[in-house]
Amino acid sequence: MELHVLNHPLVEHKLTVLRDKNTPSSTFRELVSELVMLEAYEATRNLSVVAAPIETPVAPMTGKKLASPRPIIVPVLRAGLGMLDGMTRLIPTAEVGFLGMKRDEEHPTQQVTYANRLPEDLSGRQCFLIDPMLATGGTLVAATHYLAERGAKDVTAINIIAAPEGIKYVEEHIDPSIDFKVVVCAVDERLNDKCYIVPGLGDAGDRLYGVID
């Protein structure tokens, strides 16, 4: 597993405003989108490209374009949807799949899959899993293996905040045959007894969309 933690003043500034409990949902959503675009720049560094002959107004040249098959972006519902706009603005030609998973509250590292909209065959595809929080690591491992069962071998997770416990769990449980990377804005102190990241930013889904009772 390869872990990349962004180190940039713009990331630190935006993340501080994002964490603030007084930041309204509208601003929170915009900041998530902006942070994801900054993360995606690093996460997409190894996207496959092919030669593309073109003509500029001055002369012919050979540039580069994204190769086929197209990369696929997979938000983990529901909080991952808040990161989708930033990703598709950067890679508008990417395909989008959806994966609904939620943590079993009695067994925090176990997941319940309740929805999926994914191609049956992900062989040869570069996959980007997006979910704001890497807390226990259970969702990320389950989602990655879900993609791997469909043939994915190149998976990059983009999370805004991670907990050390979650990173450790992922390192210990991810299938080593997968080319797996994680890009985060920050690694926080720890998880509390409710498996929330500390200091964290609260429940990302609730802050993006409001609380659903």
Swiss-Prot record:
Residues that hold uracil according to the record: 197, 202-204
Binding locations of 5-phospho-alpha-D-ribose 1-diphosphate: 78, 103, 131-139, 203
Biological processes annotated in GO: UMP salvage; uracil salvage
Cofactor comment: Binds 1 Mg(2+) ion per subunit. The magnesium is bound as Mg-PRPP.
Reactions this protein catalyses: UMP + diphosphate = 5-phospho-alpha-D-ribose 1-diphosphate + uracil
Cofactor(s) listed: Mg(2+)
EC number: 2.4.2.9
Regulation: Allosterically activated by GTP.
A Pfam family assignment: UPRTase
SUPFAM superfamilies: PRTase-like (SSF53271)
Record-stated family: Belongs to the UPRTase family.
Name of the protein this chain belongs to: Uracil phosphoribosyltransferase
Native source organism of the sequence: Bifidobacterium longum (strain DJO10A)
Record gene name: upp
